[in-house]
Amino acid sequence: MDIKHGYAGQILRVNLSTGQFSTVPTGSYADRFLGGRGVALKIYWDEVIPQLDAFDPENCLIFMTGPLCGVPGFAGSRWQVCGKSPILNQFSYANLGGAWGARLKFAGYDGLVLKGKADSLVYLSINNETVALKDASHLKDKGAIESREILKDELGDSFCVVTTGPAGENMVTSATLLADSDSSGSSGFGALMGAKNIKAIAVNGHGKIDVADKKAVKLMRQKVRELKYDPFIWPTTLSQERMEKDICFGCINGCMRVKYHPANGRSGKYCCQSAGYYEVRAQRFYGKVTDVPFQATKLCDDYGIDTRAVETLMMWLSRCHKAHILSEDETGLPLSKMGSLEFIQTLLRKIAFREGFGDVLAEGTLKAANIVGKSADRYITDYMIKTGEDSPYGPRMHITTGLLYATEPRMPIQQLHEVGLPVLLWALRAGGNSDALLKNNYMTSEVIRAISKKFWGDEIAADFSTFEGKALSAAKIQDRQYAKESLILCDFSWPITHSPITDDHVGDPTLESQVCSAVTGMNMDETDLDKIGQRVFNLQRAVLAREDRKGRASDTIEEFNFTIPLKAEFGNPDCIVPGRNGEVFSRKGMVLDRQKFEKMKDEYYAIRGWDVSTGLQTKTKLEALGLGDIAKALQQEDLLV
C-alpha cells in the first residue's frame, strides 16, 4: 500500500542483541490494519511464537502510533505498546499519552519494534534520522522520573523520553513504562524493558505529517472541538487551587488530567484511578487532607509500578493482616500504618527492589496469595480478575461488560468507559447529584436511550434490567474501540457519544471515519472503519487462540460475579441504572445470572460469525474480513471451525 498522508512511512526495528537497526514500510501493514493496535498485532502474529516466554529475548516489544498521531486538534497522539505480558504470559496491550508518540512520528517513524537483549544496560536515542544505542549504566536503579529528567538534561529538553524504574529493571510483573507528562502504561511492559536490558527510549523529531485534505481537516477540527466541550471535574479532596490543566499533544479541549503542585514543590500528573488509589486510606490514617495521596502516585511512577495493581494488593494485605495470616514481622511492612507515607514508601521500595517479602509481592497478588498459602487466596476471590486487577464497571451492574471482560486479555478499560461513563452521568443526575462530574448534566433517560440506539444498536441496550440487546452492544463497542485503538484516539475524548451543543445531546458515530478520511485520503464511512475494528479484534482473537485461549472455555469471568451480591459501585452507591423505558432500576444486591450469561455468549458468537457451540472463529468469517492468511494458519493448528 502506498501511503502518502497521515503516516511517516516506516517502522524502525532495533535488535538489542546485535545492535543492528533496520526499517520496514508501514504500508505493508496499514492497508488492512491501519495503525496502532492493528499494526502491532500483525507484527506480533508474524514474529512471536505462542510457546515463547514473555522474558525471552525473542519476544517483541512494539511501540506503535496511528495515522492521526501528530495531527493537532483530534486527541489522536496517543500511542500503543504491545507484547507478550509477563502477567499471564500472553499478548496484551497498553496505551499512553503525552507527546512521545508524536515525537517518534516527527522523527520519521510510525512505530518501533524492539527485539533481543542488550549485553549491558542501554538506552535508545532517536534524533530524527540518527539512531544509536548508548550506555545507561549511570541510570541503573534510578527512578523513572529521575531517569527521564537526567536524559532530558543530557540530550536537550526537546527530547521526549519513555523509561522504566527499578521495578522494570528487576522484572516486577506489574512494572510500568513512564513517558513525558507522567503518562504510564501497564501490562507489565516495564518488566519487558528490564528483561531486554533497555532503560529508556529518548526521541526527538522535527518532521511534519502531511494530511490529504487540509480544508476538511480544519473543518473537522472545529466541529469536533465544539461537540466535545464538556468540562469534567475529577472528584478529589486535594486543593483545586494547586491544580492546573495538563494537556497532551494535539488534544481537543483537555480532560480531567491535571498537574498538581504539592507543598514540597515536586509537581506532576494527577489523573483518574492513579490519583485516587491511596486517597481514602491516607485520609483515614491522617484524619485530614494531605499531599500523601499525590506523593503515593509519584512513588509508583518513579519506581515504575502500576497503581491499580498496588490498590488491589493493599486490599489483600489489609485483609490478611486482619485475619492474622500476615504479620508485620514476617512481611517487614508496617501494615498497621496502611494509609501513611511510611507504609507506601516501604511497600513500593520492597517490591521494586525485590527486598525480602517484596520479592513475593513482585510476582503479583494472585501468585503471592498462592505462595503464602494459609487460605490467603480466599481474600481475593470477591474482587480480583485474572490479571490481578479489580473490575470497575463490572457485569453485575452493567451486564454488557461481562462479554468485554470475558473476551479480553486484560481489563478493557476503553471499552468499559463507553458503557460505564454515560451510565454514571445518568445515575448522578437521576440521584440528584447532577454537577458532580459534568457541569450542566444533561444525561437524561431519553438521552442515554438515544445514545444506545445510535451507538449500541438498539435502545434496549440501555435497559440494564435485562440481558436483551447486550450481545449486539458488546460487539459494536468492541469494533468501534478497536478502530479507535488503531487510529489511535484518546479514550477520554472518543467516541463522542454525547454533546452539550446538539439538540438531542447525542453525538455522532461517523466522526472517526470522517477525520480518518480527511487526514489519510482513504475514503471511508462508519461501516468501513468498523470493519477495520472488527478485523483487528478478530486478529487479536486469533493471537490469543494460539496462546491457549480457545473459545468458549476461555471466555469466562470470575465466579464472584455469579455468587456475591453487588454492594456498591464507584460514584453510584445505590447501583442505579436505567431500566425499562429509562426508569430508575437498582442492581444493588444482585448477581449475574449464569444461564443468561451463557445464552448471551451464544448470541454474541452468532453476531460475530463464530461457531456458537465452541466460540471458535470460522474460516468463512475470517475470509470475509480479509484475514484468509490468518484462517489458513489457524486451520493448520486445529483452531478454526
Language-model regions: role of each:
Residues 1-245, 302, 366:
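Basic, polar low-complexity surface loops/patches
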Residues 77, 152-187, 193-641:
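Extended C-terminal regions of large enzymes
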